Amino acid sequence: MLTKPLQGPPAPPGTPTPPPGGKDREAFEAEYRLGPLLGKGGFGTVFAGHRLTDRLQVAIKVIPRNRVLGWSPLSDSVTCPLEVALLWKVGAGGGHPGVIRLLDWFETQEGFMLVLERPLPAQDLFDYITEKGPLGEGPSRCFFGQVVAAIQHCHSRGVVHRDIKDENILIDLRRGCAKLIDFGSGALLHDEPYTDFDGTRVYSPPEWISRHQYHALPATVWSLGILLYDMVCGDIPFERDQEILEAELHFPAHVSPDCCALIRRCLAPKPSSRPSLEEILLDPWMQTPAEDVPLNPSKGGPAPLAWSLLP
């Protein structure tokens, strides 16, 4: 049976389609209100906010112009940051429930403001694991399957994320589902090797460490192996470059042989030995019957439901 998330939550009512060109600061202030700081990253700063017409809660990513690493044409007359173009591509036609959606974007004198959906309550997977420790194989399988399906969608739209890690997985605590966020390190998908990498080094594959080049698909699978290890073990397997090159894995006793085997497949030192995304979903460990994800968004809140997996 194929492990695959069911249809995700519907789009917020009245969600606008991003315009072909970014609007200016005055237009932003007429439509949205900027709220408190949520976090800072290498490519921008993220604030809470809301839409004035209906008070829809959103995340607003502010990117200084000098932090834009790549540009892309949206039309014959409009050029935008590559991150906007990538989000536009993965969000076209309703997007995917496992990928964060770009609702709007604006260009200011200082840079760009990206308005993104913001499920509430939510927590990134790094904080979730830090708080709870190893997730157990049931929740890990559920979240991991959703992330793999989200990446499949991105690749089908010609987009490679290039920074798959726990901090870039947002957990919707009410629904028990995972969303891929932050395409700041992303690129257009192609078959030729990539010779640049702006992602997180401890998630990077050995071929990048040794040769400073990699292919999109096996590098993505490597980072998925790191992510799954993090979920079931509570921490990443490698910290130093030499550890990445040696790829020597040690598992706690509670991790099942089937789970260990899938992680070892994903973290094969030779890129051609790693499975495809489709093969990951067909792996015996991924075929284990699904179970609900035990989340606790807040005291007194409704019991969240995990996405089921199709038989």
Curated annotation (Swiss-Prot):
UniProt binding sites for ATP: L38, G39, K40, G41, G42, F43, G44, T45, V46, K61
Domain Protein kinase, chain residue ranges per copy: 32-286
Residues annotated as the enzyme's active site: D163
SMART domains: S_TKc
GO cellular component: cytoplasm
The keyword Nucleotide-binding belongs to this UniProt entry's keyword annotation: yes
Location of the region described as Disordered in the Swiss-Prot/TrEMBL record: 1-25
Family under the similarity heading: Belongs to the protein kinase superfamily. CAMK Ser/Thr protein kinase family. PIM subfamily.
Protein name, per record: Serine/threonine-protein kinase pim-2
Organism encoding this protein: Homo sapiens (Human)
